[in-house]
Amino acid sequence: MRHVSVLHHREEPGMGAGVRAVLGDVSGEVAVFGSLNADLTVRTERFPKPGETISGEDLVILPGGKSANQAVQAGLLGAHVRMIGAVGADGHGDLLIESLQRAGVDTSAVQREDVATGTAIITVDSAGDNTIVVSPGANGTVDVSTAQRHQDVIGKARVLGLCMEVSPDAVEAAARIAHDAGTRVVFNNSPFHPVLSAGLLEAIDVLVVNEHELADMLKPGASDTAAELECERADDATDWADCARRLAAMGIPSAVVTLGGRGPMVIEGEEITPVDPFP
């Protein structure tokens, strides 16, 4: 079994090159509200069949959780970051706290709960495909009251980072607190939710999605205030100007649309800007 250092936090689009293109530089006070997980990964030649036991390589334990990954990225970029969330009173919780602190993240708003730390059980086969089962653990204790208890942290931040790995009600509560305080809300819609409440949509300053998720969000009925049609396409190319108009109709002023290895597309009002992948 191997434990791996802070540098092995996965890079999340929530603080990537596209978001930095919108915000300028990710500096000053940044708050991140959400999930912390220990990623337990085993590589194996193939996935087992139902009821089958097979051998794999050594277990690798990585610090993770989409929100924790965002916090580490922002910390390594020089921002003063405060993480708001929860871990268990166990070794995985210790690993996550230590990894955040090594990146310069303030963990004083991370609660230690009398439950297991959230974990992701990941199996990777020889082709690089994976299966993931997430046990929320302490992340399940992050609720609306968590956001309310830390409204001073959220309100003093220049930017609030959010994703959807904790309760949607808690995410909306944190977003509303930030919006009312003038804090910019960067919302990474991951794990993807095609339907978002009007209250959350109104609070989002920067939406982060991939191109397929964007199309799903812009389908009829995808949200309380959704535009009527998904982005029109011509010659198999996305009509980014049309996407921008439809996002504006939903009340979202800016978006970062990730395109895999091609780098993200940044939408700011009517401006459409391709951004080179961050090295």
Could you describe each region identified by the protein language model?
Residues T41, V133, D216-P220, I267:
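Residues that scaffold the ATP/ADP-binding catalytic core of kinase and kinase-like folds
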Residues R2-R10, G16-V30, P194, A222-P279:
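Conserved phosphate-binding/catalytic region of the ribokinase-like
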Residues R2-A86, G91-L95, Q101-R102, D276:
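Glycine-rich phosphate/adenosyl-contacting loop at the front of the ribokinase-like
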Residues P50-I54, I61, L76-G161:
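Conserved N-terminal subdomain of the carbohydrate kinase-like
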Residues P48-P50, S99-R102, D125-D129, E202-V206, ...:
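Short, hinge-like loop/turn segments at secondary-structure boundaries
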Residues V159-D242, R262-P264:
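Conserved beta-alpha-beta core of the PfkB/ribokinase-like small-molecule kinase fold
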